[in-house]
Amino acid sequence: MELNDLQAQRAAKLAELRAAGLDPYPPRCYRSHTIAEALAAFDDLVAQSTTLTLTGRIIGARRIMGKIAFAHIEDGTGEIQLWLSRADLGDEWFERFRDQLDTFDIVQASGVLRCTKTGERSLFVRELAILAKAINPPPEKWAGLQDVEERHRQRYLDLIVNRDRREIFRARARVISTMRRVLDERGFLEVETPVLQPLYGGAAARPFITYHNALGQNLYLRIATELYLKRLIVGGFPGVYEIGKNFRNEGVDRSHNPEFTMMECYQAYADYHAMMTLVEEMLSEICLAVHGTTTITYQGRELDFRPPWPRIAMATAIADRTGIDITQITDLDALQEAISARGLRVERKASWAKQVDELFSEFVQPHLFQPTFIIDYPVAMSPLAKRIPDRPDFTERFEAFIAGMEIGNAFTELNDPFDQEERFREQLRAFAAGDEEAHQMDEDFINALRYGMPPTGGLGVGIDRLVMVLTDQSNIREVILFPHLRERSDE
């Protein structure tokens, strides 16, 4: 790669360091304390005149004032000022700092802690070493990398110059670790299921397709973990969960990324009511772990995670917002006419279930800001959920919504192998009619159900969207370290 002028200047300094017999990228380093540890013990270390060694990246502008120089370093735990003098450091290394080191270089500094005359806690440096010479300079606007797409494309640079963004991903880690703790404490077993699958299922989505050369067969990146996890319930595990990546060949927008992280769990001898309780308790505990409270602000509005959350039947929610009663309009053309009368366009070939989904997404979902359960979905929208006994056209299914986004999806799981087989056949008919997101026929899963699956509650939670809410981010790309991006226009 060709270097620009600033990179060339830094490369020349790199050559000077090597010519002086120094390795600008040594294999080892030493530090006695992290910066956070040094600052926490500052008074004691000053009182004892302890010599300590810190490491970190030079951030901000270096200041050279005759025989004295200043710089700040940070190591991921904290930030501290380096105070360097020609008298303490010696001519050679003082001039090396002045002439050959730059912002973004990573250094090792030894000395003692003191406060400057202005009261700033500082390391008064007596020895200095280079650990990594940075060839790329900081972006022109040091206050932050301004271009949003470039921040996502060069996440490493984003994390250097916008250090507050690291807190988003620390919060994400707390979300996942707390989720694991909650499930482990409730007796769920963490398992791993295949990412490459011969059939795709467990969700309405288009898959990514790949090919296994040795086996000579098409494989799919999983769109959900559901069908394998339910096989484990059949096998005798009382409760299982998996946290991992799913992949859906769909559009990219503020709440969708083709590669995303899901938690799915299944509990034997439970139903969707038990899953609602689990969601309320788990997400309120997660919110408490991240923020120390169950009441937070998202995009300027207050959110309250405390249980119990409202429960609203889907048909009721749609009727309240649109006046359309989906329990009465079962004819496809009649439903499309009613939807069109309210200004919503849907494809002529869209199925009844797809039209209801579009209707709900347009008129109801944006209003679900507080944590809310939408329950009792039509059976046509829920091919893996158990029917409500006295309302067989609807299922024991709910979705959890927060801030207008679907965060969770859960069922009382369908365990009747004959009903499941017929649902799959209905999905095949939908696929033949043009629904590219319809389920495949999974005969092995039906065979598993024939051995008997106990009454089971199942739940999926979208971790990326949950992190969005808990870190007050309006775009899913801000909570994924390396989100999917289009190729550069100049590539």
From Swiss-Prot:
Cofactor binding summary note: Binds 3 Mg(2+) ions per subunit.
Entry's Gene Ontology cellular component terms: cytoplasm; cytosol
Protein EC: 6.1.1.6
Span of the signal peptide: none
Cofactor: Mg(2+)
InterPro entries to which the protein is assigned, alphabetical: Aa-tRNA-synt_II, aa-tRNA-synth_II, aa-tRNA-synth_II/BPL/LPL, Lys-tRNA-ligase_II, Lys-tRNA-ligase_II_N, Lys-tRNA-synth_II_C, NA-bd_OB-fold, NA-bd_OB_tRNA
Reactions performed catalytically: tRNA(Lys) + L-lysine + ATP = L-lysyl-tRNA(Lys) + AMP + diphosphate
Residues holding Mg(2+) 1: E399, E406
Quaternary state and interactors: Homodimer.
Protein name: Lysine--tRNA ligase
Organism: Chloroflexus aurantiacus (strain ATCC 29366 / DSM 635 / J-10-fl)
